[in-house]
Amino acid sequence: MNGNEFGRLFRLTTFGESHGDAMGCTVSGVPAGVELSEEAIQEDLDRRKPGQSMITTSRGEPDKVSIKSGLQDGYTTGTPIGMVIQNKDARSGKYEPFITAPRPSHGDYTYSAKFGTRNWGGGGRSSARETVNWVAAGGVAKQVLAQSDYDVQIKAHVCQIGDVVADDVTWEEMLEHSEDNEVRCGDPDAAEEMRDLADEYQKEGDSIGGAIYFECRGVPRGLGAPRFDSIPARLGQAMYSIPAVTDFELGIGRDARTATGTDYTEDWEFGESEATASENASGDEPRARGDPKPVGNDHGGIQGGITTGDPIYGEVTWHAPVSFPKTQETVDWETGERKEITVTGRHDPVLPPRAVPVVEAMLYCTVLDFMLLGGRINPDRLDDRPGEYDTDYHPSSPRNDPEDADTHATTVDED
């Protein structure tokens, strides 16, 4: 099976099935010298894990991450970082009826058709549980960026569930409110309506779709490449890889369909400059000025597939979860019968509340990959000091050799 890797220099490779022993990933391309905190990665995993509220699946997974490689004394060494998350609460019995009677709108039939077999417990590899690996990798990327010379900040919140749409919120409102409610919405009033709506569908044995708004700040200008490695192309791959995503928008997105060229085009002006004109400069000489800057940001921080330095923003849309208790119809290819089925496993009635950290993680992974590709961050070492070996993150020699050591080193008197 291919398609298990994402990224060019910062590369994520994942493994695991929903009801297997464990989930895991290998992250390569992490520069040496990053002080990596397992606890910080865990914080993001806790935001994604199941069982957080009454509108999430009741599956009791602690999602505890364990870093297995790539660290020495708490610092990255430049070698691949391996992480494992054990599955603790898998119950595959309820999925046995669907081995040859595929659930509607799932990957059951298509996986069997492609490979001639599949891991059927909990959906196996096609389950959204696999995104736990992405959040772990995003936690690594987030820490690399936080310790770099760039102040990259990324935040997302649920902007719509069903027909309940949140008001536009500021960056500060997202930071203040989105983690204060079960649906992770930056608009507290809309959050209550969204919560009630999700609860209503859950009680009816049904589900509902929704959307997430995201914003990236501090991304420097000049990242991305024309055509197939453009920022929109790579972000689109990242977002459409998330299970159940049906739409991805940048900037004003679908509203561009009704905008005229004169409305959508943004003029250029000089931004503010930190520099000032010389005290003795004559009035005829040009004064210090800032860099060219677009007037407005309908383009979402990207022009020609390359970043402008303005905030990158957009929306991601999910269809309703297709596992729910209401009766559905399918066919059993082994018996040749039509069957009525009820999917009674533990499932979310709406996906965006738990998908917020997934979106943020994939944004962090994508932005860091472009920063490495663009030379903004040294891919070998974070301190960008090639050839220097006596660093504050290099392991120190022991003061005394262990008594049972087979080898030893003693100081030589140079006199």
From Swiss-Prot:
Gene Ontology MF annotations: chorismate synthase activity; FMN binding
Keyword tags: Amino-acid biosynthesis, Aromatic amino acid biosynthesis, FAD, Flavoprotein, FMN, Lyase, NADP
The keyword Amino-acid biosynthesis belongs to this UniProt entry's keyword annotation: yes
Catalytic reaction equation(s): 5-O-(1-carboxyvinyl)-3-phosphoshikimate = chorismate + phosphate
Cellular component annotations (GO), alphabetically ordered: cytosol
A Pfam family the protein falls into: Chorismate_synt
Positions contributing to FMN binding: R125, S126, S127, G304, H319, A320, P321, V322, S323, R346
Family membership: Belongs to the chorismate synthase family.
Role noted for this protein: This reaction introduces a second double bond into the aromatic ring system.
Name of the featured protein: Chorismate synthase
Top-level taxonomy: Archaea, Methanobacteriati, Methanobacteriota, Stenosarchaea group, Halobacteria
